[in-house]
Amino acid sequence: MSNRVIIFDTTLRDGEQALAASLSVKEKLQIAMALERLGVDVMEVGFPVSSPGDFESVQTIARTIKNSRVCALSRALEKDIDAAAQALSVADQFRIHTFISTSTIHVESKLKRSFDQVLEMAVSAVKYARRFTDDVEFSCEDAGRTPIDNLCRMVEAAILAGARTINIPDTVGYTVPSEFGTIIQTLFNRVPNIDQAVISVHCHDDLGLSVANSITAVQHGARQIECTINGIGERAGNCSLEEIAMILATRKGMLGLETGINAKEIHRTSNLVSQLCNMPVQANKAIVGANAFTHSSGIHQDGMLKAQNTYEIMTPESIGLNRNNLNMTSRSGRHVIKHRMEEMGYSEHDYNMDALYEEFLKLADKKGQVFDYDLEALAFMEAQAEEDNHYQLQQLVVQSDSTEGVATATVRIEVGGEIKTEAATGNGPVDAAYNAIARATDRRIDIISYKLGAKGVGQNALGQVDITAVYHEQNFHGVGLATDVVEASARALVHVMNLTCRADKVADYKQSMQKNRELGGV
């Protein structure tokens, strides 16, 4: 048996079922092209019979994608198969995926037929799909709850009818790994023509076991895993592609299996899907979460600096990230602070380590996470633990034209003790406020991240805005709190402005320090 596991991505079909709004054809094509770069073997991109929009997107993707096999879903109905075949006909290579329910509860309650009638429908559908392509996949919906005798009969009949891939879904995420592995093993033991098809699995995450069940299945002979980027999908989601890919890569020595996935594209693809689908990835998500390669514990950080594999079983570079993050918090040791200062270009003779670490701990207790620019300021500025509020927002007034979408903002800001008033327009109230603040401060920064949240519950909650901005090729993080979202946004920007002002002072100090070195000074 081959040790190659086929990766069947269904982000654009099953994954899209989790979205509040459908993706546009252009957005689906963007994701499809990213999946092609990622190296998925098969991508299921829609359900053509369901709507003209889905038909168009399947056809557009089928026409464009060359290096992955494009697949479309159909029920075990001729009209569904016709629509799938027509949409896919423009592709160089394609697959028709047809399915029918096989569990007793589905057969009796949903289909209202006998199992024998359902089996006949499945056989007819597979034979009909084979008129259009040799690559036909058949799925036994709710296989995880199907009586094993019935499942074996269905699989044997579908293979005999011409299916070259047989998919065994745990549609409602009900099984546990030992149980699901037994199902796969039983199929291999009892279905006489099983060697004529690839056995696939499609596991849902209702009990959080989709990845574990999928790995167990390939250990028992399955050779295709159906999955989605970031694990998105109906209800609790699907098996996560990035987790499967990195499990098989990281544990190749034990599992003896491999995929064709280009792992360095994982991070980029995850971000794209998250943004286009408007589904943020939870910070502690395996592989692609913001904290996946972040270390805050002082003991862990010290170990990481000595040898990365003390606390990392894979590298961030392996999924396309530049490096891991050592969050500087009150739990960070002196070794971490010294390491960060060295990375920023400072030798231990440039600052007083004892004084710096003492002030660092004070600031970390006060604000939680300390950033590089904080550390520089602590090392070289007076009143080290206090932020230099060169800019202070005094007043913000916003007027918005709901019909045109143009807003006007007027701000009064104290700039180094001098009061300045400026007005500006923008595409919405937040944009207008930002433009007015930029005018008043005469300081331009690029916002690369804007996150809106809340502090508190109900009517008493405060709007919290977190922004990340780039200034002189360095990232700065600002936070604003207010009952009004626009005001919170303005306060976050002013926070960043103060940080950049302080960074400029640090840069001037560094420059003078460098001149003293060159002149032989202390």
From Swiss-Prot:
Location of region: Regulatory domain: 392-522
Chief localisation class: cytoplasm
InterPro entries linked to this entry: 2-IPM_HCS-like, 2-isopropylmalate_synth_dimer, AIPM/Hcit_synth_CS, Aldolase_TIM, LeuA/HCS_post-cat, LeuA_allosteric_dom_sf, LeuA_bact_synth, PYR_CT
Binding site for Mn(2+): D14, H202, H204, N238
Cofactor requirements of the protein: Mn(2+)
EC number assigned by the record: 2.3.3.13
Molecular function per GO: 2-isopropylmalate synthase activity; acetyl-CoA C-acetyltransferase activity; manganese ion binding
Domain of life: Bacteria
Pathway of action: Amino-acid biosynthesis; L-leucine biosynthesis; L-leucine from 3-methyl-2-oxobutanoate: step 1/4
Record's keyword terms, sorted: Amino-acid biosynthesis, Branched-chain amino acid biosynthesis, Cytoplasm, Leucine biosynthesis, Manganese, Metal-binding, Transferase
Subcellular location: Cytoplasm
Classification via Pfam families: HCS_D2, HMGL-like, LeuA_dimer
Catalytic activity entry: 3-methyl-2-oxobutanoate + acetyl-CoA + H2O = (2S)-2-isopropylmalate + CoA + H(+)
A GO CC term assigned to this protein in UniProt: cytosol
Alphabetized PANTHER family for the sequence: 2-ISOPROPYLMALATE SYNTHASE 1, CHLOROPLASTIC-RELATED, HOMOCITRATE SYNTHASE-RELATED
Role played: Catalyzes the condensation of the acetyl group of acetyl-CoA with 3-methyl-2-oxobutanoate (2-ketoisovalerate) to form 3-carboxy-3-hydroxy-4-methylpentanoate (2-isopropylmalate).
Subunit annotation: Homodimer.
Family: Belongs to the alpha-IPM synthase/homocitrate synthase family. LeuA type 1 subfamily.
Family annotation (HAMAP family): LeuA_type1
Protein name: 2-isopropylmalate synthase
Organism: Shewanella baltica (strain OS155 / ATCC BAA-1091)
